[in-house]
Regions:
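Short, flexible active-site loop motifs that bind/organize anionic cofactors or intermediates
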Residues: 44, 101, 177
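Short amphipathic alpha-helical segments
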Residues: 41, 98-100, 167-169
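Donor/substrate-binding cores of folate-linked one-carbon enzymes
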Residues: 1-91, 96
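An anion-binding loop in the catalytic cleft
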Residues: 104-204
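Acyl-group handling in specialized metabolite and lipid biosynthesis
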Residues: 93-106
């Protein structure tokens, strides 16, 4: 059972901004993911999809598809479709914790997808004043800034406004090392952020 867009990693489809994912029921083959396909279903990926929510959708869709497919296998009426020898479906790299490190030189849109794709595991993160800051939710802003990527140029009720290589990202739900996950408005009531502070890619 693999994604119809990426083989192996569900999160990657969200990270790369794909519009659909899916589940395939197939025979076991000699090689990795080479067996004939029996049935498949395509699942749309919503603009607010997270890796966790997509996993849940695919798990349910896969279970439903298997229940529908088993009778045809038992009765010998299932139709088998060979996979192309040169599969157009790319194998995604294994998801690691290191993939969650936010590189603010990237565009705000790319980083927003990274945050969604790695929620709930392994989570996107950056470093604020030498401490790990996990980012659980964020949104792309239409604001303009000439600040260096990674610079916090405003922290208010809306969130932590951060300059990116292209565009602005507003962090709306975060978790500082050793603290609970919380909406940014609540976080800022107990943690003062000076405008101009820059997120880093390492601890001090």
């Amino acid at each position: 059972a693999a994604s119809d867009v990426y083989k192996r990693q569900i999160q990657q489809a969200v990270i790369d901004g794909e519009k659909v994912s899916g589940v395939t029921i197939q025979q076991m083959g000699e090689g990795l993911d080479t067996g004939d396909m029996i049935s498949k279903i395509v699942i749309p990926i919503s603009p607010t999809e997270t890796g966790g929510s997509l996993f849940g959708k695919l798990a349910q869709a896969g279970a439903d598809l298997l229940i529908k497919t088993l009778p045809s296998i038992e009765q010998g009426t299932a139709e088998f479709e060979k996979q192309p020898e040169e599969s157009p479906t790319p194998y995604a790299a294994m998801i690691t914790k290191q993939m969650g490190l936010m590189d603010f030189r990237k565009s705000a849109e790319e980083l927003e997808r990274l945050v969604r794709g790695l929620n709930p595991w392994p989570s996107a993160y950056t470093f604020l004043n030498g401490k790990t800051l996990k980012v659980w939710k964020c949104k792309v802003s239409t604001e303009k800034t000439d600040a260096v990527p990674g610079t916090i140029f405003l922290a208010d009720k809306e969130g932590i406004h951060t300059a990116c290589g292209e565009g602005v990202l507003i962090l709306t739900e975060v978790q500082l090392e050793g603290k609970k996950r919380m909406e940014t408005e609540a976080f800022l009531r107990g943690y003062h952020i000076e405008n101009g502070i820059v997120f880093t890619d390492h601890k001090e």
